[in-house]
Amino acid sequence: MLVFMSDDLAGFSRQTTVPDGAAGRRFDAVLAELFPEFSRSRLTEWIKSGDVLLNGVLVRPRDPVYGGEVVWLQVMPDIRTDAVPQDIPLDILYEDEHVFVINKPAGLVVHPGAGNPDGTLVNALLHRDPALAAVPRAGVVHRLDKDTSGVMVVARTLQAQTALVEQLSSRQVHRQYLAVVVSALVSGGTVNAAIERHPRDRLRMEVSDTGKEAVTHYRLRERFRAHTALECRLDTGRTHQIRVHMAHLRHPIVGDRLYGGSLKLPKGGTDALVAMLRGFKRQALHAEVLEFLHPVRALPVRIVAPVPEDLCQLLAALREDSALFFEREWR
């Protein structure tokens, strides 16, 4: 059975099992039969780069299989091999010889690509630790959108990266986000709605019956008169997942120009809130909590990224507006 898993980097991961009848054959040959949509040369490249695990460990293309092993295929977009170190400040929440945990600011792209050849998190990481040049994708394990802030883990060794990718694929990593959405919700809930790339606008994702499984749990953190602060937890990690799911509920994230539609201002809002909403230039989404098992020590790690100043100011303006509104209503 083939299982589709997370695609945090707009890549994908899949799990399947080696059939018993394949015993004694080369791993790369069996892999080509399990994933016929990819060329054998590409699969061999992924094996060598550490993107494929057999029973949780790295193997060589020529190694034999015995039947019954679990295959993990985790593919992320290639990061430019010519990325250069750049002295870009990093807010490091935790580090040891195996991992960095970064508090990524809004506005910082994770890896170089079209339109962002440098000035990215990868460039900053290579400056902070030149040895990351020897780790696939410079140690990047998962990503955040450019205008989403918050906590990310980066592997400093291939061993750590392999273990963390496996945890992500098997949904052992806990990720909690703070999101400020339009409308005053009365309760939390779960969105179980598959997501795929929009057929015409390739920058967008959309809910679709033919998409990949996507599950988001959300609960109320703070309720205002026309907005709500939510805590969102991911079971899966699809591209733009929280943004797409909240828009699907018709409660788009404040400041989300891709999925939020036109600016929505509360009737009778304070001048401070109106100015804040007009001037909020990114989606109000922050990766606040990351929990995982240390990839080497196997101990639980829990890291909390402080709420950034722009979101604190937005929440303060919402509180003030709500207080004044309800004060007028109660008179």
From Swiss-Prot:
Key word Cytoplasm present: yes
Residues in S4 RNA-binding domain copies: 25-97
One GO process term, biological-process aspect: enzyme-directed rRNA pseudouridine synthesis
Catalytic activity: uridine(1911/1915/1917) in 23S rRNA = pseudouridine(1911/1915/1917) in 23S rRNA
Record localization: Cytoplasm
Molecular function per GO: 23S rRNA pseudouridine(1911/1915/1917) synthase activity; RNA binding
Pfam families associated with the record: PseudoU_synth_2, S4
GO cellular component: cytoplasm
Catalytic site positions: D145
Keywords from the named record: Cytoplasm, Isomerase, RNA-binding, rRNA processing
Top-level taxon of the source organism: Bacteria
Described function: Responsible for synthesis of pseudouridine from uracil at positions 1911, 1915 and 1917 in 23S ribosomal RNA.
UniProt family annotation: Belongs to the pseudouridine synthase RluA family.
UniProt cross-references to NCBIfam families, sorted A to Z: PRK11180.1, rluA_subfam
Protein name: Ribosomal large subunit pseudouridine synthase D
Protein source organism: Xylella fastidiosa (strain Temecula1 / ATCC 700964)
